[in-house]
Curated annotation (Swiss-Prot):
NCBIfam families: MG075_fam (NF045696). The keyword Cell membrane applies. It comes from Mycoplasma genitalium (strain ATCC 33530 / DSM 19775 / NCTC 10195 / G37) (Mycoplasmoides genitalium). This is Uncharacterized protein MG075. One of its GO terms (cellular component) is plasma membrane. The lineage of its organism: Bacteria, Bacillati, Mycoplasmatota, Mycoplasmoidales, Mycoplasmoidaceae. Coiled coil: none annotated. The chain crosses the membrane at residues 11-31, 951-971. It is found in: Cell membrane.
């Protein structure tokens, strides 16, 4: 939405209710009557001086039309080398440009009438109103001249007449006063020679910069006054900047807010910090538990709803609204009530909430949320939204209030290109007081789909290093079906349609025409994106059982499969509900270990620090269970086709590795038996036939997985038995020395502010946590692949090895990384943590200001080349991790791992990732308060499928010779999660993309790599 459109509507609302805090546009029809009345009053003043009414006539006191300038990076006002086209700016960014722009404005605009209007207000507010009880006011001279639109002279002479019968004090500007005898007069003069008007700034309602002016030197009754202004707090010239704020950027503000005797040091004490840290840990834990049980209840409802009426998502959410309220009140005080009402804003809900009820009952929360979006157009409007609710006491009266402005809103919608796409939705809300949010979402899914697609496209352009992840997200939102989840249809059926069925996607051809393309289901597309090209050795296996599996990639026309999918999903949801049941989740508990130590804050002239921090909690896990039923329900998504012989043939005996091995032995003979090359072909043929004969052709791939995972037949697996039990404990610790405390800004400009602890060590010790398989013995007397091959048993042993390695290499370890511990502006009880006084210039902060020299760009090598094929270990994140670690080793050979603040390599690490702006690079304090983490979690597994003394019959003319061979198939692979992240204390502009700019305080680079080495079977003769 354009600012001009919003401002016209909202400032008109302001005018209608008599608010004068904002200069009003004179073109709005709503104000014409009001202005006419004022003009008539000025032309026909009442003459009875006994009522003390002003009879000073100032001609043509008419404000100018509003002129609002949006500052962009286009050489007109500012021209920054590495900057986005659009940005927020603090006033200091334009300090040396304001006078120039003001002079240009004066030269092109006739402002004399507006100056007269300012003079009229000054006479009223400064001379007349303070003295009206005893004095009449008239003017002998009233000469205000403007030369060349930029120079002004004054010759004003006022006469105050004391109409009382007593001597009275006459109040004069700048706290002066004189006593005037009864029925006598006093002359007051204001004089200034021709001088150039000097620019003067003031804060508008949204704290953006409004322009007033001052006269450099004025004589007030003979006393010289410098920089004199008729109205320093607003001006009828109505000149302002849209995205420039009369506030400090965070780098400027820090010197005024942090340090001995300053705001943060006065407001934050040691007890606050200790309590906030403890509450933070406990809140995060509670949020995790409530989220888990909430999901468990929802999954259970979907899973157990087998027959009858469709069970929609919104019906389930509506039934859980109390749980949602509790959860979101933890996330942000007051948010729970809004979310609870929001999920009931549907015609499907038993306790329906209309859009107007939602707005009326959650006004404050909604405004806070909109502030957090930091959209400049919205922020310019929010300060006057309160006017809309003035005198409103019900949702119905809110609807009537908005109806009174419909004639203003509708033309604005049609005139604004961006708003026009939302016209149908907005008109639906305007026309009907009984509209519901989720009904609007479903009914207007085409509109919202287009907006969402554009948003994802724009966001992807700002995050080039996450292109693969965005490809997956784009696939999810490739058509409007995502919005069907909010309909009254059965939710599980819609999940099957959306995630497990092939999708129809519209594409735009080169000639501009559209065509429909059938693409993989979202699940299969996601799995392909995650797997990539790194599992070539099992490509056939993946194709058969995953990518081409009708249960996971259904053709939309196959309704019989859809029924099976839906039933399987419901069964799966039911067992997930059991895993996340309150009984199971409550086996995980949080206990304070060290949380009551006395904290000490130390301060200097420019800092506030925690001298020593050591807060520890322990999480106890008492036999948290993952049941066999969960694994069994997952296996139901594999095809139940009997006889896996074709699969074994493709995976083992038609693989390139096997063919290479066979060809080698056919040419060279078996080692030590080169003279007997003639038996090699028959040996291999017999080996293959022996494998085939060992396969139970009445069993499916599900049964083979049961052999591997349970060690028993699928039919004998008890659903209620445990598959994995997690037991033990892990500790959480926040610690560090001399930790900086800084403000934490959460929205554009607001009095509510939090604080942050910078560069805190966060330590997780999970060495006492165990995860144990409960099926540890292979006991299936009739496996899928039986003797003499016994491949089922070998697969079972391989699975155990992989699981145990993963637990030891990933779970039972210690992890330490850095973070900024941020506390939001509101406490758990909803009260403000810290409050700025926005009337004080050093407490108005615009945290998202672009500051030239503090921007950055991603290094080009972090952006994958889409034209080249991604190979194992070649992702930019892995290269970045290696570079950061090499940098660590180069600079940090003799330092303890946790002591990061004293390392000289922090700037070097940042420069491996980013091209830093010159001021950012030079600000060592900011660099020291920046976090760089390079973390890698890796589990490797190496095992061997073994078949010993495999008897192979070799037919030799008149008799059969039985030879014995050993077969080994090595399995060697790894799973690696690599993460490099950067955390800034304040938000910076990422200008890596010319078209789309992000404002960020955190960068995350992640890479998941699953690698399976090509298996080369080893097959050798061991005797007769």
């Amino acid at each position: 939405m354009k600012l001009s459109t919003i401002t016209t509507i909202c400032l008109s609302i302001s005018g209608a209710f008599g608010t004068t805090a904002i200069a009003l546009p004179t073109t709005v029809a709503l104000l014409k009557n009001h202005q006419q009345q004022n003009t008539e009053k000025q032309q026909n003043p009442i003459k009875d001086i006994r009522f003390g009414l002003n009879n000073v006539q100032v001609p043509n006191t008419i404000p100018l039309h509003q002129t609002v300038v949006e500052v962009t990076n286009n050489k007109a006002i500012v021209d920054y080398k590495d900057a986005p086209q659009k940005f927020f700016l603090a006033k200091s960014a334009l300090n040396n440009k304001l006078q120039v722009e003001f002079d240009k404005f004066l030269l092109r605009t006739g402002v004399i009438n507006a100056l007269n209007a300012d003079l009229k207000e000054w006479i009223d507010q400064t001379l007349f109103i303070p003295n009206q009880s005893f004095f009449d006011l008239s003017a002998n001279k009233l000469n205000l001249t403007l030369s060349n639109q930029s120079e002004v002279s004054l010759d004003l002479e006022f006469i105050f007449t004391n109409f009382s019968d007593k001597n009275q004090p006459l109040k004069l500007p700048f706290d002066g006063s004189v006593v005037v005898n009864a029925n006598e007069s006093y002359t007051y003069s204001v004089k200034a020679t021709l001088q150039k008007l000097k620019v003067l700034t003031y804060s508008r309602a949204d704290h953006s910069v409004g322009i007033s002016y001052a006269i450099p030197t004025v004589s007030l009754n003979g006393k010289t006054q410098n920089d004199f202004s008729f109205n320093p707090f607003k001006s009828n010239i109505n000149f302002a900047f849209k995205n420039v704020y009369n506030a400090l950027n965070p780098f400027e503000a820090q010197q005024y807010l942090v340090g001995q005797g300053k705001f943060l040091n006065q407001k934050v004490n040691a007890d606050d910090v200790k309590n906030d840290i403890n509450n933070h840990i406990e809140t995060q834990f509670n949020v995790a538990k409530i989220t888990a049980t909430l999901l468990g209840k929802a999954f259970k409802q979907f899973g157990e709803h087998k027959n009858g009426q469709p069970l929609s998502l919104l019906k389930v959410l509506s039934g859980l609204n109390n749980e949602f309220k509790q959860l979101f009140n933890y996330v942000r005080p007051g948010l729970g009530d809004f979310v609870s009402d929001l999920i009931q804003s549907s015609s499907q809900s038993s306790n329906k909430k209309t859009v107007y009820q939602l707005l009326f009952e959650n006004k404050t929360t909604i405004i806070h949320l909109l502030q957090d979006l930091n959209i400049s157009e919205l922020n310019s409007v929010l300060p006057v939204v309160d006017i809309l609710f003035e005198g409103i006491n019900s949702a119905e009266s809110l609807y009537q209030r908005i109806q009174s402005f419909k004639d203003l809103i509708v033309p604005a919608l049609k005139a604004d290109k961006q708003l026009k796409s939302l016209e149908a939705i907005i008109l639906a809300v305007l026309d009907n007081p009984n509209t519901y949010v989720f009904d609007l979402v479903y009914q207007n899914k085409s509109i919202l789909f287009n907006l969402l697609s554009d948003f994802l496209k724009n966001t992807a352009n700002t995050l080039p290093f996450l292109q693969e992840q965005f490809d997956i997200v784009n696939h999810l939102f490739a058509n409007e079906a995502i919005f069907d989840l909010f309909s009254n249809a059965d939710f599980v059926e819609k999940i099957a349609d959306l995630f497990l069925a092939k999708q129809k996607v519209q594409e735009v051809n080169n000639d501009g025409t559209k065509s429909t393309k059938i693409v993989d289901s979202i699940l299969v597309a996601t799995l392909k994106g995650l797997v990539g090209d790194q599992l070539s050795s099992i490509t056939e296996l993946l194709n058969i059982y995953i990518f081409e599996n009708e249960f996971l990639n259904r053709n939309d026309s196959n309704s019989s499969v859809k029924k099976q999918q839906t039933d399987s999903l419901k069964n799966l949801f039911s067992v997930i509900g059991d895993i996340l049941s309150e009984t199971n989740v409550n086996k995980i508990t949080l206990h304070a270990v060290k949380n009551n130590e006395l904290l000490s804050l130390v301060e200097t002239a420019s800092t506030l620090k925690i001298k020593h921090l050591n807060v520890q909690y322990k999480v106890l896990v008492d036999k948290f269970e993952l049941k066999n039923s969960f694994i069994k329900e997952l296996l139901n998504f594999f095809p139940d086709t009997k006889d896996i012989t074709p699969t074994i043939k493709k995976v083992l005996f038609e693989s390139e590795n096997y063919k290479t091995l066979r060809k080698k032995y056919e040419n060279e003979g078996f080692p030590g038996y080169h003279w007997a090359k003639f038996i090699v072909p028959g040996t291999f043929n017999s080996a293959e036939n022996t494998f085939y004969s060992a396969i139970d052709k009445t069993k499916s791939i599900r049964d083979l997985f049961a052999d591997m995972l349970f060690g028993k037949s699928l039919e004998s697996v008890n659903d209620s038995d445990s598959f994995i039990k997690i037991n033990g404990s892990f500790t959480l610790k926040y610690h560090g020395d001399n930790l900086n405390l800084l403000p934490n800004y959460h929205s554009l400009i607001t009095k509510n502010v939090g604080y942050q602890i910078v560069n805190v060590n966060f330590h997780i010790d999970a060495r006492l946590l165990t995860a144990e398989l409960q099926n540890t013995v292979f006991s299936n007397p009739k496996p899928v692949i039986k003797s003499p091959v016994e491949l089922s048993k070998s697969l079972f042993e391989v699975w155990k090895t992989i699981f145990e390695n993963s637990v030891n290499q990933i779970l039972k370890k210690e992890y330490t990384f850095k973070d900024n511990l941020k506390f939001f502006p509101f406490k758990a009880d909803g009260s403000s943590r810290l409050e700025f006084d926005l009337s004080k210039p050093d407490q108005r902060v615009i945290p998202f200001a672009f500051v030239d020299g503090y921007q950055f760009q991603l290094k080009k090598e972090l952006i994958p080349n889409k034209e080249t094929k991604k190979e194992a270990n070649s992702s930019p994140v892995l290269k970045l991790y290696d570079a950061v670690k090499r940098n660590d080793r180069q600079y940090r050979p003799n330092h303890h791992h946790d002591d990061l603040r004293n390392y000289p390599s922090l700037k070097s690490q940042l420069e491996l990732i980013l091209n830093l702006g010159d001021k950012l690079k030079a600000n060592n304090d900011f660099i020291d308060d920046t976090v760089v983490n390079a973390l890698q979690y890796k589990t490797s597994f190496k095992s061997t499928l073994k078949v010993n003394s495999l008897g192979i019959p070799i037919n030799l003319f008149f008799f059969t010779l039985w030879l014995k061979f050993n077969l080994e198939i090595p399995i060697d692979g790894s799973l690696t999660l690599t993460s490099v992240n950067v955390v800034f204390p304040y938000s910076l502009y990422d200008t890596s993309s010319n078209e789309f700019t992000r404002i960020v305080d955190r960068l995350n680079f992640t890479d998941t790599n699953f690698y399976l080495k090509d298996a080369f079977p080893n097959f050798w003769f061991v005797g007769f």
